Amino acid sequence: MKMLTRLQVLMLALFSKGFLVSLGDHNFMRREIKIEGDLVLGGLFPINEKGTGTEECGRINEDRGIQRLEAMLFAIDEINKDNYLLPGVKLGVHILDTCSRDTYALEQSLEFVRASLTKVDEAEYMCPDGSYAIQENIPLLIAGVIGGSYSSVSIQVANLLRLFQIPQISYASTSAKLSDKSRYDYFARTVPPDFYQAKAMAEILRYFNWTYVSTVASEGDYGETGIEAFEQEARLRNICIATAEKVGRSNIRKSYDSVIRELLQKPNARVVVLFMRSDDSRELIAAASRVNASFTWVASDGWGAQESIVKGSEHVAYGAITLELASHPVRQFDRYFQSLNPYNNHRNPWFRDFWEQKFQCSLQNKRNHRQICDKHLAIDSSNYEQESKIMFVVNAVYAMAHALHKMQRTLCPNTTKLCDAMKILDGKKLYKDYLLKINFTAPFNPNKGADSIVKFDTYGDGMGRYNVFNFQHIGGKYSYLKVGHWAETLYLDVDSIHWSRNSVPTSQCSDPCAPNEMKNMQPGDVCCWICIPCEPYEYLVDEFTCMDCGPGQWPTADLSGCYNLPEDYIRWEDAWAIGPVTIACLGFMCTCIVITVFIKHNNTPLVKASGRELCYILLFGVSLSYCMTFFFIAKPSPVICALRRLGLGTSFAICYSALLTKTNCIARIFDGVKNGAQRPKFISPSSQVFICLGLILVQIVMVSVWLILETPGTRRYTLPEKRETVILKCNVKDSSMLISLTYDVVLVILCTVYAFKTRKCPENFNEAKFIGFTMYTTCIIWLAFLPIFYVTSSDYRVQTTTMCISVSLSGFVVLGCLFAPKVHIVLFQPQKNVVTHRLHLNRFSVSGTATTYSQSSASTYVPTVCNGREVLDSTTSSL
């Protein structure tokens, strides 16, 4: 036992300088409250604020000091009057002042362990007669301690009390460090740890999209661990810290001024997060007021809803968002506290100082130029508001009482008094078996729901619930208004919040990007970015990435995705369609008229002399070429695309095969005349038809093979420079379409060559001249068409219209050059549509529909020249 005592004294000496002197100095004076009882609870409260300079203690802390102290006394009185809670057991108290300093609090707390040391050592002091020595000034044996307030105080005290297994319950310490049961294994609290509060503060910032903020913390466990927890929560929500400042323990004005200057260096960080003790918060707000700095403050419960913090600096604090632990006012305490005055409250040695400070008067003769206090002064609703943590102080006292009650019922089942088993408390058993397992309804709570339950989790922590306040100016006065709450999730009544500039402030490193812009993040910083516009055809995958929708798609209005663009093609009602269709219809009508005239006058000399069979084939090809306009204007489909590919080349092949057959026939006839050869072969009508069909068949075979190798279909085509337009086209390249006309080009060239060769035929064969003119004009049309076709490839409307008009013009050239003169004679010069002469050649003659053989003739003739050879013109012109 002696070894144990010395070990304890040694460990205490490590914690407090001058402890042994204090322990043995009976003249050591301190202010304290001592009320004897069967069981005594210690109490630690910041009755005085921190002193400045060499002073340990400063002014009286009216709210957090005096009110909380009286709350403990009030709770002890109520428990001692309770017939169900610890009946027959009187609770006493031993209350000390911490002066808001951890080192001072530790020195004061040594008084709590004196009884433990004295109790251990008293067996060593015996009188000669064998009786124990009577000791003076015996310290009270402490069953448990209520306090402290600041986390730094509780940490220091907890390190001491654990050595003597004295349970401790704090009513205000929220540092996350205190949840570490390996270090603070006799500590509990009726408030939650700060990481809940840090989470709530981060969610408030995220709610208002404040992503770039500054922070200020008080030096010590409360501020440092609290702001560390906040920074972790902020990172999870992509909130950046512009500057992180810390206020030391010196409490010097210039240090607060320096912090304000640093905050002003970050103009984009309009929101400042405070995790500070109340006195530090007050000094910082005062420093901001001195330079008229305007910030939106988001403060922890160190600020809470205290009027004293903003007094004199209300205009700077206006619009602040503050958090306070969710609590309800204890109305019974209001009545108790308002009944106190210096004349009836003799057990509180600090109450007279509190009274003089509150009413700015003196209870004795005039001091400090103050007047004598009026005896009618009283605490009432006009000068008093219950401090926010009174409920937690009361709950802490009741929690200790409930634990002692359960322990007394277990160890002393046969009496309501303390039995020998509880004369010396087992602090470890009290803490682990009873205190951590308490579960009761909070006293004086008007609400009887789940929120009124007092209990501890496995770490000895209270439940995490917070109220959100807004500092406002209403009705000519400043006050705090509750605007929300947090209990795992955040609720805010945004409409009730007042802002310093009448609108929700912004606090961002960079301005928000426009809906069509992405954020280009700066290296190593998730809150600063450059806004880069997305391309018109891109959508936003997220706020950092623009993604190409791909060909044929376009982003939605909100850029959240893409949709398929409507297919664009020439419609029948478009101006681009009306023109070509009108021309094609006109050409088709003209063709029908020619066919009708030819059929009606099918047996006339002129029609016979024109080669009826080839003319009808030629007219069919012309009709088909006009029909191609309708195929090119129609909406592309596999069938339409097949008809386009088949019809375009085939229509030309029909026309030019007929013309080639005719010019070839004429050329062979007159070559035979020139050379004196036998009658040429295959110049009969049936032979010419078969030759023509053979030439057409070549084209049909080529196109058929092409259709087999490249199956007709459609495709959605988008020009790189016109991504917003999707053109529905046939799945064939423009070059392939023109290549398919290669055979037709060969036919055109051959026709042109033969037409040129037969250009000097006699007048009755001057149809060759008209064929030549037709071919020359056709070549000019197509030579003009090809450049236009390729140049306008970017505009399918112009390209299609050009194609249709060129095809129609080719038909008009054939009608105008070859058939118009014939129709004119048939209809308007019928006198020329008769047989008056016969053509006599040396060895050939042409009559009717063909050239016939003749041995000789005596008819007269008019000499003319065909290919340098004289021939006879003895019939009408064959036009």
UniProtKB/Swiss-Prot annotation:
Cross-referenced PROSITE patterns: G_PROTEIN_RECEP_F3_1 (PS00979), G_PROTEIN_RECEP_F3_2 (PS00980), G_PROTEIN_RECEP_F3_3 (PS00981), G_PROTEIN_RECEP_F3_4 (PS50259)
Function: G-protein coupled receptor for glutamate. Ligand binding causes a conformation change that triggers signaling via guanine nucleotide-binding proteins (G proteins) and modulates the activity of down-stream effectors. Signaling inhibits adenylate cyclase activity.
Organism the protein comes from: Mus musculus (Mouse)
Highest taxon above the source species: Eukaryota
Cytoplasmic face of the membrane: 600-613, 665-688, 757-769, 829-879
Signal peptide start and end residues: 1-22
Topological category with respect to the lipid bilayer: Multi-pass membrane protein
Extracellular side: 23-576, 635-645, 710-734, 793-802
InterPro entries membership: ANF_lig-bd_rcpt, GPCR_3, GPCR_3_9-Cys_dom, GPCR_3_9-Cys_sf, GPCR_3_C, GPCR_3_CS, GPCR_3_mGluR3, GPCR_3_mtglu_rcpt
Designated name of the protein: Metabotropic glutamate receptor 3
GO terms under biological process: cellular response to stress; gene expression; postsynaptic modulation of chemical synaptic transmission; regulation of sensory perception of pain; sensory perception of pain; synaptic transmission, glutamatergic
Subcellular localization: Cell membrane
Positions of transmembrane segments: 577-599, 614-634, 646-664, 689-709, 735-756, 770-792, 803-828
Coiled-coil intervals, chain numbering: none
Residues noted as binding L-glutamate in the record, renumbered to the chain: S151, A172, S173, T174, Y222, D301, K389
MF terms (GO), sorted A to Z: calcium channel regulator activity; group II metabotropic glutamate receptor activity; scaffold protein binding
GO cellular component, one term: axon
